Amino acid sequence: MSSVEFSNQPVVIDNGSGVIKAGFAGQDPPSHIFQSLVGNPKYKKVMGLNIENESTYFVGDRINDWRGILKLKHPMDHGIVSNWSDMERVWTYTYDQLKIQPSEHPVLLTDVPNNPRLHRERAAQLFFETYNAPALYFSIPAVLSLYASGRTTGIVLDSGDGVTHVVPVFEGFALPHAISRIDIAGRDITEYLQHLLRRSGYNFKTSAEKEVVRIIKEKTCYVAHDPQKEEELLEPDSSSSKPVQPQYTLPDGNVIELGAERFRAPEILFHPDIIGDESLGIHQCLDMSIRKSDLDLRKTFYSNIILGGGSTLFQGFGDRLLNEVKKLAPKDIKIKITAPPERKYSAWMGGSILASLSTFKDLWVTRQEYEEDGCSVIHRKIF
């Protein structure tokens, strides 16, 4: 079908498992960033507000005002939508925040690789039939992160809240046979930190308290260069000077002291077996994806490793990854890891760049195409 023109700026939505990033193509950074959470009241009546209808829900900034009386749920689990009603509520809130008519703006939506085809078809159905979007395009976050770094070839390690991917990209196209996926990411680190804190006597039970643990994770956790050495420093009989144990003040004013939990929690990215998962570590997946790529591309990929996603932001993450990959890679191979400072939003930024290009108009799936060919049309235009 011939290319189409749209008078209104495309909307870019990075549909993360933990955080939604949304705004208009050409913007930098995204204009709206909020937790991908839906809160339902745990009680029927709270102060002067009568909440008796189960359809009552809270999304985005409204959650902060009522957090203590809400049961919080993520619509997505490991990159896959698990509750479509809640996902629709999050997208409706997104449009409300953007203050636009959905029928007037094409949408670029991120979707992680190797997700079920039915997942993408259901999303397309919602955008075309519920929101009446004029056009839609799905793109892989890792590819967009690469664009944001100014490259079209490289290998991206993208670790967000729900899932971690290693995606080799050549000239803007992901190499599907070499993609690696690990269902361990930020939310798993939060849950393991919650477990470790419980063992230390700090009990965080509710879904709202779990959000407090997530914030503790983001503010205090780090990746140890040598976990064994860190453990030895914390041993009671260690002769070495012990590191200062940082403290964290909880919303209720209580103070907790954090020790080995700070590096033990993120360690599951490198050693999933700590939590009983049989997946390979991220460094092993990265090396495996490179080795699955064509022989003449491997050298390029080793020297163009790009980090993306919020779970790569831990202090020490890049140095540790480099050290681990060096142990696995061929000798004398040049290894370079690039960690863009804005990588928490790099997928959105890449989408903003892509949707702004004049040539991108050829890639949209229009509502007319959807109505003529059905859901299958969306699988023809994705990379």
Curated annotation (Swiss-Prot):
InterPro entries: Actin, Actin_CS, ATPase_NBD. Keywords: ATP-binding, Cytoplasm, Cytoskeleton, Nucleotide-binding. One of its GO terms (molecular function) is ATP binding. GO terms for biological process: vesicle-mediated transport. Residues 227-246 are annotated as: Disordered. It is found in: Cytoplasm, Cytoskeleton; Cytoplasm, Cytoskeleton, Microtubule organizing center, Centrosome. GO terms for cellular component: centrosome; cytoplasm; dynactin complex. Gene3D superfamilies: 3.30.420.40, Actin, Chain A, domain 4 (3.90.640.10). CDD domains: ASKHA_NBD_Arp1. Its main location: cytoplasm. SMART domains: ACTIN (SM00268). SUPFAM superfamilies: Actin-like ATPase domain (SSF53067). Belongs to the actin family. ARP1 subfamily. Component of a multi-subunit complex, PPK2 (poly P kinase complex 2) involved in microtubule based vesicle motility. It is associated with the centrosome. PPK2 complex can synthesize a poly chain of hundreds of phosphate residues linked by ATP-like bonds. PANTHER family: ACTIN. This is Centractin. The gene is arpA.
